[in-house]
Amino acid sequence: MARKRGSSSRKQKKVGFDYGVVHIKSTFNNTIITLTDKDGNTLTWASGGTVGFEGTRKGTPYAAQLAADKVAREALRMGIKKVDILVKGPGPGREPAIRTLQGAGLEINQIKDVTPIPFNGCRPKKRRRV
């Protein structure tokens, strides 16, 4: 029988930051939101799957909203008040995640789009015909 894990003490030690970076990776299938310190060390994260959605519902704007709310609450609990936001990807969860972070009481310093764009790199997949 599997043993139930206790809560990690690692999160408790990280308290004391006042500034963080929120990375939002939004694809058509899911939205992953990660809170890091300025050096890039992960403090907490959430996604459409961790807030209780499965399958295609993970990619919805509502799932991104709930994931952003979870990250924002954890950030405020750690004492983080100011954040930079780095957004990557074309998914539908980009805007709701940013709005939720702003509405949760985090002060947003800057919002950057860091979606990777190839300078004519690999040949893309053939176009889908329906």
Swiss-Prot record:
SUPFAM superfamilies associated with the record: Translational machinery components
The keyword Protein biosynthesis is assigned to this record: no
Give the CC-aspect GO terms.
Answer: ribonucleoprotein complex; ribosome
Which GO molecular-function terms appear in the entry?
rRNA binding; structural constituent of ribosome
Q: Does the keyword Mitochondrion apply?
A: no
Q: Which domain of life is it from?
A: Bacteria
Name one process (GO BP) from the record. Answer: translation
Any single Pfam family the record assigns to this protein: Ribosomal_S11
Give the record's keywords alphabetically: Ribonucleoprotein, Ribosomal protein, RNA-binding, rRNA-binding
Q: Which cysteines are joined by disulfide bonds?
A: none
Q: Which InterPro entries match?
A: Ribosomal_uS11, Ribosomal_uS11_bac-type, Ribosomal_uS11_CS, Ribosomal_uS11_sf
Q: How does it assemble?
A: Part of the 30S ribosomal subunit. Interacts with proteins S7 and S18. Binds to IF-3.
Instruction: Describe the function of this protein.
Output: Located on the platform of the 30S subunit, it bridges several disparate RNA helices of the 16S rRNA. Forms part of the Shine-Dalgarno cleft in the 70S ribosome.
Which family is this sequence assigned to? Belongs to the universal ribosomal protein uS11 family.
Q: What is this protein called?
A: Small ribosomal subunit protein uS11
